[in-house]
């Protein structure tokens, strides 16, 4: 499939696109743990805000980014591009669009987390000007550890 990036539409996710987004996330993140089940994550996210952005090309959802904003910092939580649409500028356009949208609501800094072993994705974000910061990321499951 030849991708025409000039015909891509990048916008906020719309209700009714759930199945397309779920299918994309299952394709891109096949080994996600059960607590990251896409349908419940989407539902929970939309109860908080609408910071889910999608890329549509020829009527097909080929990319998505779930973002967050705490009133100061923004976050890129999940960036996904269908495997057949990668290395064609989709992810770059999506990340730039998401950062622009975050800036428009007052965001002054954008953060993200990736696995330290994921060198390909690390290089992708470094190319935007992200840098590795001296931070320690911690997490605990509510109800199990807390």
Protein language model annotation of sequence segments:
Residues 12-78, 101, 132-135:
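Acetyl-CoA-dependent GNAT
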Residues 87-100, 127:
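Conserved acetyl-CoA-binding loop-helix of GNAT-fold acetyltransferases
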Residues 128, 135-144:
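Active-site/acyl-donor-binding loops of N-acyltransferases
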Residues 79-86:
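A short, internal acetyl-CoA/4′-phosphopantetheine-binding micro-motif in the GNAT/acyltransferase core
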Residues 1-16, 145-146:
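Conserved N-terminal entry element of GNAT/NAT acetyltransferase domains
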Residues 112-121, 143:
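Conserved beta-strand-loop-alpha-helix junction that forms the acyl-donor binding cleft
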């Amino acid at each position: 499939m030849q991708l025409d990036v000039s015909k891509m539409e990048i916008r906020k996710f719309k209700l009714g696109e759930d199945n397309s987004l779920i299918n994309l996330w299952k394709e891109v993140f096949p080994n996600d743990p059960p607590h990251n089940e896409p349908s419940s994550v989407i539902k929970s996210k939309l109860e908080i805000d609408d910071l889910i952005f999608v890329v549509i090309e020829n009527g097909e959802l080929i990319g998505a980014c779930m973002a967050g904003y705490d009133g100061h910092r923004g976050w890129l939580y999940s960036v996904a591009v269908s495997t057949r649409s990668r290395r064609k500028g989709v992810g770059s356009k999506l990340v730039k669009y998401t950062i622009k949208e975050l800036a428009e609501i007052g965001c002054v800094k954008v953060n993200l987390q990736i696995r330290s072993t994921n060198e390909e994705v690390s290089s992708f974000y470094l190319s935007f000007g992200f840098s590795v910061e001296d931070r320690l990321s911690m997490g605990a499951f509510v109800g199990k550890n807390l």
